[in-house]
A protein has these predicted regions:
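Generic serine detector
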Residues: 14, 23, 85, 93-96, ...
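Residue-level signature of catalytic and energy-coupling elements of molecular machines
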Residues: 68, 82, 120, 135, ...
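Amphipathic, well-ordered alpha-helical segments in soluble domains
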Residues: 78, 85, 134, 196-199
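Predominantly long cytosolic amphipathic alpha-helical stalk/bundle segments
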Residues: 84, 90-91, 96-191, 205, ...
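Hydrophobic alpha-helical signal-anchor/transmembrane segments
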Residues: 1-94, 245, 268-275
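Helix-termination/interfacial motifs at the ends of transmembrane alpha-helices
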Residues: 16-17, 34-57, 63, 171-249
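Generic detector of short alpha-helix boundary/capping microenvironments
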Residues: 22, 55-56, 70, 103, ...
């Protein structure tokens, strides 16, 4: 007799944009944009006296170009943060679903209060996204527990477990690529410090040359140090704002999930008192 095969566990249904899973592609592209911006925009001959990038800068763009080879690295980090932020905005919007999450939460709680599980499921199907997926898993467990031959406490625990499992499946979609933004918060500052040190080394080398200071070399070194400091701090600033914004959005979504999950479990407990 042939052995019966167990059906495969259902995969999480993909709904909307799930995020870029190969972030290295974004990083490479961002650094390519940063390098091109440095070479062809900041390094445009029109930004320098006599059209010579080695000469004196005529404007701020030329001054930033004089920051040296650390500048395109910082620009690459900045472009990475911007690209990752756009990716997270799209992904987290998809996780939120089609409608307002707060209104969706209120409608689900009202449907549960009325004992209308079918309406709650219909609301989830219309909403879509991670929050709706978690609520659907809770409601499915709710229905299954109605005919399960186990004690009430075990049924409530099963509904809570279903909620935790589905939440664990959805969280990676929401938090994906956030560690990269968090890393750039530190990398931006450290790269700026590195560029600053290189600029100061160049300045002191100019001071030490022949016992006197070459004013051109000295100003170049100081300019390099300050440009790297400013651009690195700006990159870290953008990264901090982006990271905190997205973590706050995710916290609100997980709070909505937990609020509805708690309501479903306790609604079941209230409507199915143990004999």
């Amino acid at each position: 007799m042939a052995a019966t095969q167990k059906p495969a566990a259902p995969k999480k249904k993909s709904q909307g944009f799930q995020g870029v899973r190969h972030a290295i592609i974004i990083i490479i592209f961002a650094f390519a944009v940063g390098i091109c911006f440095y070479l062809f925009f900041l390094g445009n001959p029109a930004n320098f006296a006599n059209g010579d990038p080695e000469g004196h800068p005529l404007n701020m763009l030329g001054t930033v170009y004089k920051g040296g080879w650390v500048v395109p690295i910082i620009l690459g980090l900045l472009c990475t943060v911007i690209a990752m932020s756009v990716e997270r905005i799209i992904a987290i919007s998809a996780c939120s679903g089609k409608g307002n999450v707060t209104k969706f939460t209120e409608n689900i709680k009202k449907a549960l209060k009325d004992g209308d599980i079918a309406k709650a499921e219909d609301l989830c199907n219309k909403q879509g996204g991670s929050v709706a997926n978690v609520v659907l898993a809770d409601l499915k467990s709710y229905r299954e527990m109605e005919s399960a031959p186990i004690k009430l406490k075990e049924k409530v625990a099963a509904i809570q477990n279903a909620h935790e499992e589905e939440t664990a499946l959805e969280m990676p979609t929401m938090t994906m690529n956030l560690p990269i933004i968090a890393t750039i918060v530190t990398l931006g500052t450290l790269t700026a410090l590195f560029g600053t040190v290189l600029g100061m080394i160049r300045s002191f080398a100019a001071l030490a040359a022949g016992g006197g200071a070459d004013s051109m070399a000295l100003s170049t070194g100081i300019s390099e140090a300050l440009v790297n400091t400013a651009s690195g701090i700006a990159t870290s600033w953008v990264s901090v704002v982006a990271y905190n914004y997205f973590t706050n959005k995710i916290d609100k979504l997980t709070f909505a999930m937990d609020e509805i999950g708690y309501t479903i479990a306790h609604t079941y407990e209230d409507k199915h008192p143990e004999a």
